[in-house]
Design a protein with these regions (language model features):
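N-terminal glycine-rich phosphate-binding loop for ADP-containing cofactors
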Residues: 1-172
C-alpha cells in the first residue's frame, strides 16, 4: 500500500510492455488516478485497479476500479475473467476513497472499536458477534484485521480521512 513503490514499478513496466497490454494493481484504497499519473495514454487506457477481499480464497467479491481513462473493454475483460476463471463476483467500483467494500468495512471496524472500548468486550466476543451471526465471513472483525494487516487497516483509514475532509464521521 505504498503509492511511491507502485509508481516506480509502473515506470519500469512501461518501458517493456507492448502497447495494449493490460496492467492492474491490487490495492485496498490507493486512488487509481494517482497510480497511473505520468504514464502514457496507452498505459492509462489499459490500466485499472483491483481489490480482492481477504481471505481471498474464501471471499468471492472482486472490485475492479477503472482510472479516468480506462477503456471499457478492459473492465469487461476483467469482469468476465474474475467470474469465469477466478470464481469471483466482479463489481465495477468508482475511484472513490477505499472504493466500495473497504469504505463500508473500515467505517464498520472503526465504529466497532469504539463499542469494544465502551462495552469492555473481548476479542473473542467481538468476533463471535461480528461474523456469520450477522451475515459476515467467519473471519469476523479481529481475525480479518489480522489477515489483512493492522498496517493496511491504518493506511486505508488514514487515506479515507485524508481524502474525505468533510466527512461528518471522520473522527472515528
Amino acid at each position: 500500500e505504498r503509492l511511491d513503490i507502485k509508481q516506480q514499478v509502473f515506470e519500469k513496466l512501461e518501458k517493456y510492455r507492448t502497447p495494449g497490454t493490460l496492467i492492474t494493481s491490487n490495492t485496498s484504497g490507493i486512488p487509481i488516478k494517482f497510480m497511473n499519473e505520468g504514464r502514457s495514454e496507452d498505459f492509462q487506457k489499459h490500466f485499472c485497479g483491483t481489490h480482492f477481499f481477504n481471505p481471498a480464497r474464501y471471499l468471492k467479491l472482486f472490485e475492479i476500479i477503472p482510472g479516468p481513462k480506462t477503456d471499457a473493454s478492459v473492465l469487461e475483460f476483467l469482469s468476465g475473467y474474475g467470474e469465469q476463471f477466478l470464481g469471483k463476483t466482479s463489481v465495477i467500483a468508482k475511484d472513490t476513497p477505499a472504493f466500495i467494500g473497504n469504505r463500508i468495512g473500515i467505517f464498520s471496524i472503526q465504529s466497532l472499536f469504539h463499542a469494544v472500548k465502551d462495552l469492555d468486550l473481548t476479542i473473542e466476543e467481538v468476533d463471535k458477534l461480528s461474523g456469520p451471526v450477522i451475515g459476515r465471513p467467519k473471519s469476523a472483525t479481529f481475525r480479518t484485521v489480522d489477515v489483512v494487516g493492522l498496517d493496511t487497516l491504518v493506511h486505508v483509514a488514514n487515506g479515507i480521512a485524508e481524502n474525505c475532509p468533510k466527512d461528518e464521521r471522520k473522527e472515528l
